[in-house]
Amino acid sequence: MTNIVVVGLQWGDEGKGKVVDWLSNNADAVVRFQGGNNAGHTIVIQEKTYKLNLLPSSILHNNKLSIIGNGVVLDPYALMSEIDNLRINGININTQNLVISESCPLVLNIHKEADTLFEQLRQNTIGTTNKGIGPCYADKISRRALRVCDLFDKKDILYNKVNNLLNYHNLLRQNFNILPIEASKLVDELLDIAPKILPFVKPVWKVIHDLTQQNKTIIFEGAQGTFLDIDHGTYPFVTSSNTIAPQAFVGGGINLSHSSCVLGVIKAYTTRVGNGPFFTEQKNEIGKSMFERGNEIGTVSNRERRCGWFDAVLAKQAIILSGVSGLVLTKLDVLDQFSEIKICTQYKYDGVIYDYIPASSYVQNNLEPIYETVPGWKENTFGSVTYEDLPKNAISYIKKIEEILKVPVYLISTGPERNAMIIINDKFLK
């Protein structure tokens, strides 16, 4: 099997975790290449549900290497909590199956507090998870962040780095009349958590290079979705990292000569958590029905997801940005209840037709979707095991999506369980 990059083509929550878990059977390693514990993957194995935030989905498999790449911002306390919870549930996690990049910036409590403060300052809140992700990435870009490798430092060297970080954060806290953080206290906290993290730490770029030299198969696991990308998303309602496929090379530490298949994971309808434009949102019984049947609750935020019709304009743009080779269609069964189904094929604003998402947030907020209506099937697709099992109109719907997007559907997820997957085209597995 070739190396595979798995990305979400909407606003996250497309089902990437299940897809990566399924693919892990035929892979040697899985790399998380961006984001932090603000994203969540839900995986169901033999009716038992696992919720992952930082750990790659491969951690639930035996003899697979799980890698947290340098593009991830790492909350050491959240990571250890996640590891401890999995160990309680019988999942073996050790230095042989988990590797953490020495270059990962550290998410600290000061970042979470800053996240909350910045959200309060905004006129229009962006719906942050308050996990400290944005402020940590800001420290990284400003070259003051603490990184995992700093935990190897002697106490006096670490103190100087902490003091440099607090020069900024304590000034921020002063402006909000919040007590400053003592450098010595933060140093002690870091030295306390360090022995739990450091055994997993290696130069990930070298680990990945060695795997490629041995012709091992690597999956690069994206978090969130294309339109939460800091550059290409619906700004400012975005995350603080790049979420599209090219980020796998930067955030994983692999060079461009190692060609990869890009799988785009996409729901048969559209959802979004939090604030921001949503062009096909259904604030009616249709949206409510999608929400209830799809159990659309955020894994991390525990917030209700907004629901709407499939947006082919959004999907096509995401496919171009990531160079998607094939699609994984998820939650088709949520549409089983509808006699008619709509697909957005264009937008309209101020008399102008758009076949892409304009960058202007003002225009985005005023785009009107133009729909094409196709017949529904009113038959159960949940748990279908072959393509031929699907209702005729469900197959027509899938083919319509392929026709509009000009990319084939490789896989169809027919339920939350690991093996609830229909393979239409398996060439990427060879």
UniProtKB/Swiss-Prot annotation:
What this protein is reported to do is described as: Plays an important role in the de novo pathway of purine nucleotide biosynthesis. Catalyzes the first committed step in the biosynthesis of AMP from IMP.
Q: Where in the cell is it found?
A: Cytoplasm
Q: What PANTHER family does the entry give? A: ADENYLOSUCCINATE SYNTHETASE
Q: Which HAMAP family match?
A: Adenylosucc_synth
What's the EC number here?
A: 6.3.4.4
Where are the coiled-coil regions?
A: none
Major subcellular location class? cytoplasm
Annotated Mg(2+) binding sites: 13, 40
Q: Which cofactor does it need?
A: Mg(2+)
Q: What does the entry list as the binding residues for substrate?
A: 299-305
GO BP of this protein: 'de novo' AMP biosynthetic process; IMP metabolic process
Name of protein? Adenylosuccinate synthetase
Output the Pfam families linked to this UniProt entry. Adenylsucc_synt (PF00709)
Q: Which reaction does it catalyse?
A: IMP + L-aspartate + GTP = N(6)-(1,2-dicarboxyethyl)-AMP + GDP + phosphate + 2 H(+)
Q: Where does IMP bind?
A: 13-16, 38-41, 129, 143, 224, 239, 303
- Pathway(s) this gene product operates in, as recorded in its UniProt entry: Purine metabolism; AMP biosynthesis via de novo pathway; AMP from IMP: step 1/2
Q: Which gene encodes it?
A: purA
Return the SUPFAM superfamilies for the record.
P-loop containing nucleoside triphosphate hydrolases
Q: Subunit structure, briefly?
A: Homodimer.
Provide the binding site for GTP.
12-18, 40-42, 305, 331-333, 413-415
Cellular compartments per GO CC: cytoplasm
Source organism phylogeny: Bacteria, Pseudomonadati, Pseudomonadota, Alphaproteobacteria, Rickettsiales
EC top class, in one word?
ligase
Instruction: List the keywords (alphabetical).
Output: Cytoplasm, GTP-binding, Ligase, Magnesium, Metal-binding, Nucleotide-binding, Purine biosynthesis
The organism's superkingdom is given as: Bacteria
